[in-house]
Regions:
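Generic structural motif recognizing short loop/turn segments at the entrances and edges of beta-strands
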Residues: 4-5, 130-131, 191
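PAPS-dependent sulfotransferases, especially Golgi type II membrane carbohydrate sulfotransferases
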Residues: 157-248
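Small/polar (Gly/Ser/Thr/Ala-rich) solvent-exposed segments
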Residues: 1-15
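PAPS-dependent sulfotransferase catalytic domain
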Residues: 13-161, 181
């Protein structure tokens, strides 16, 4: 941290998991060659002692990142209903990258297991009383004050939080690639928090069966059946993490 700034790092959990971790948590384990490891360095650019890096192998660290680094951060987990996450993968990545439920990597992306595995590791590896924080996208949309509460908890200035903004001008969007236009269409056209993206947007709990029927019309029976199976499999992990989410 320098000049009063706090570094913020955002990444999908599965992208930092060890291949071994992924293989062990898939219904059908996959072979892997080795576990890559990112080595921590001192401020002078020298590698830390081997004994310190060996801790990564002995403490159950499920990621390729050094335990020393993970213990220096405040972990924040953002969760959302699996039905909304997994369908969005097809809706957004399908047209832009050809994503399909039968892709080899889809079972890895369409899972909340990596969040749960990493949450549990952080919870057991608490240092100086720092506990992992869980934010539910639904709660953030319905109760924006949760973000202000988070800022206070992290000792950040809550007045810097924005709930409204100007849409991206069409002139800028026109200069973007088709991928960017499609992938960022929602956020770029918005002017604030979109409550219609809430899982209970109509004031009712998410009706998964009704949503499945809609999917059938868009993606067909076979793809929908596979998509629904991923959602059902992820629900226990989602409900587990919901138990720890930050609330007002």
């Amino acid at each position: 941290m320098g000049q009063g700034k706090t570094p913020f790092i955002k990444e999908h959990a599965f992208t930092i998991m060890k291949p071994e971790t992924i293989s062990q948590n898939l219904t059908h384990p996959r072979p892997y060659i080795n576990n890559p490891r990112i080595t921590a360095q001192t401020a002078k650019g020298q590698e830390v002692a081997a004994a310190e890096t060996d801790d990564d192998e002995n403490d159950g660290n499920p990621t390729v990142l050094p335990t020393q680094f993970l213990r220096s951060i405040t972990p924040i987990f953002l969760i959302r209903h699996p039905a909304l996450i997994f369908e969005s993968i097809l809706r957004v990545s399908g047209p832009t990258m050809g994503a399909h439920v039968d892709d080899e990597e889809f079972p890895v992306e369409a899972s909340l297991r990596w969040l749960r595995v990493l949450y549990d590791w952080f919870a057991k590896s608490t240092v100086n009383g720092v506990r992992p924080i869980v934010l539910n996208a639904d709660e953030i949309m319905a109760h924006p004050k949760i973000v202000q509460q988070l800022c206070e908890q992290l000792q950040l200035d809550p007045t810097g939080v924005r709930f409204e903004w100007n849409p991206v001008p069409p002139s800028i969007i026109e200069g973007q690639s088709s991928y960017q236009q499609h992938f960022f269409s929602t956020i770029q056209s918005s002017c604030g928090v979109r409550l219609d993206k809430h899982s209970a947007a109509q004031g009712q709990e998410l009706d998964l069966d009704a949503m499945t029927t809609t999917w059938q019309e868009v993606y067909g029976l076979e793809t929908t059946a596979t998509l629904r199976s991923f959602v059902d499999a992820a629900m226990p992990d989602y409900e587990y993490l919901c138990h720890y989410e930050l609330r007002l």
